[in-house]
Structure formats: C-alpha cells, structure tokens
Amino acid sequence: MHIIIFIGTVNLLLLLITYFYYRINFPLSHSLSFGLIYLFLACNNIISRALPETAPLLLIKASSWLGGLWMAFAYYSLLLAVLHLLLWLASKFIGFHLPSEKLALVGVIAIFCFIAWGSINAYSPVVRTERITTAKLSHGENYKIVFLSDIHLGRLLGKDYAQRLTERVNQLQPDLVLVAGDVLDEKQAYVLKENSLAPLCQLKAPKGVFMAYGNHDYLDQPLSWQKRLEEQNIQVLRDSYAFVDGRIKLVGLEDYSKNKDVKELKRLSSNNQHYYTIILDHQPRRMQAASEAGYDLYLAGHTHTGQLFPNRLITKRIYLLDYGRAAFDSMTAITNNGYGYWGTPIRTEKAPEIVLIQLIGTGK
C-alpha cells in the first residue's frame, strides 16, 4: 500500500506538469483523445499494482511495461519542461526569439530516441572484471567470484530473465556466487506465478551461493522469502556469517533500512585477522566502518547509478562509492551497478552488470 501511495503521488505530479506542458506547446495535445490516452498510460503504474494477483500474467506485465515506459517519458518530459522554462526566462532577459513549438518537438523526438536506447541498454548486461590480490591466501590459492546485486524479480523481470542470468553466470565458471540483495522486486506472488526463482537453483558454484538482504527483500514476508531462497540453494546471511574452505569468511548484514548502526558489523568482525573476510552490505553506506573493523572486501549494490540519466549526479553525492571500486585503507570496496532495474524497464545510465572478481592468493 505504501508503494502504491508513493507511486500514485509521483505519477500525479508528473501527469499534471507534463500534460500542461504539452498542452501549451503541442496543438495536437488539445484533443480529448490525447488527454485520455495520456491519462490511461499514466494510470498503468497504479493499475499494474492494483490488479489482483490472480490476474493473467500477460495483463500484469503489459500494464507494468506501459506504466514504466510512461514514467520514463514523463520524467524526461519534466526535464524538458524545466529546460524550456529556463530558456524562456533567458529569452525574456536577453531578448531573443524562442521557437517554443519547435523546441518542444525536438525535445520529444530526443526523449523517444533516448528511451529506445535505454530499453536496449537495460537488457544488455556486461561483465566487469576486478582482480584482487591478498597475502591472506596462499600462493596459488585463487577464487573466481561472481558478484551480483539488484536482480529485482517480479512483475517486469521473470523466469526467462533469471534463466539468462543463470546461463551467463555459469559460463564464467565461478567458484563462488555472492549477491548483495534485492533478488525480489516487490511481491512474491509474481515470482511464484512465473516460478522465476527456479533458474537460480541451476547456478553452478562449487563453493556455494550466498546473499544478504536488500531493502526490497523485506517488502513481502521476509521470512517466507528467505525460506524460498534457501530452497534454491541460496544461503541467506542476515547479520550472520559463513566460511568457505576455512579460509574465507563471508559476512552478510541486514539492510541499512532495517538497521542503521554498526554494532552487528563490529560484532561479526571477531577474528577477521585470521581469514580473508568479505562483507555483503546492500547499500554502500558502511564502508568506512567496515574498513575500521578489519574487513578485506566490501561488496554493495542498491544504487543502479541512478538508473535514469542524469540521476547519477544524485547518487554520487549520497554514497561514498555509488559505483566502481575504491580502497579504504587496506580494504577494497566494490559497488555493483545491479543486474535488473526498478520501476521502469529503462536504463539510460550504465548498463546492468555482472562483476567477476578474481581473488588471487600471494601469501606463503
């Protein structure tokens, strides 16, 4: 219900602002048919969430797609309206003619092109390789780790998407798979309806598949969701840890949205000096604390690097490391761009990714 209220409020604001912008600058938008179509598209973000879970899956997906595409269009229309307003103000002060209808037309064409590219980009994952050396592991004691985050299985991303992800991961032949949360998008019902978790059971990693919860994993009965994940041989670490070969210690934290302090992070750091210690923390907010507690590798996701350009200007200012790799004293931190998406099937920032970590032992 909270998500519906939030989405509904955002949709209403976008609808009002962008509709009036087009009414001012596009003669065709004066027709009743334009208004009704625009209203219908805007309502799909609510319709897709309000449909009963027993509704046909195709209807749920179609409504979700229409609503998501409209939201991206409306977002960029809002940016276009702001740009148009600034140019209009400049024209009044400086005294030049602003061809408003032509500017709006060029802007709309650019938006459609941008969204078309973003819809392709959202389904074009890349593999990013990171090489890390450590003296805590013996020379020749190497691990190939696949690091994932933000898969977001649900109304838009289902079984086929999970199957392609599994195939891509298995092609990399990892020893270990780590997931930094948000396997779920919003409701389990859509995952169960399509059996979207089943392909993840086919992930081939001899040392195991482990994950920490993200904020979305709590949205629908987190305990039953954990049980379903573990039925697919995914071990969930919630303020807990596990060992790999007695050499690597894996720590998974509850998401920052549930527990903002660092008490558990510190408690779980006991004996870190004896192991190569990896910590999974969905939101990249506790890097400095992890470094001070003696962790070796900090893995996070969540940011999607804003997903829609130019939102990374915001994520860069919110998080210490919204994307990529950085060193915090002796600790390495990596933030994953995410494999899925949320809200709209568009990515106009960085492409979705799988991070392949080559952990190389250099010790005696």
What are these regions (language model features)?
Residues 1-123, 364:
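Non-catalytic terminal accessory segments
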Residues 107, 112-138, 155-160:
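Hydrophobic alpha-helical transmembrane segments in integral membrane proteins
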Residues 133-364:
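Soluble catalytic domains of enzymes that build or remodel membrane lipids, polysaccharides, and related
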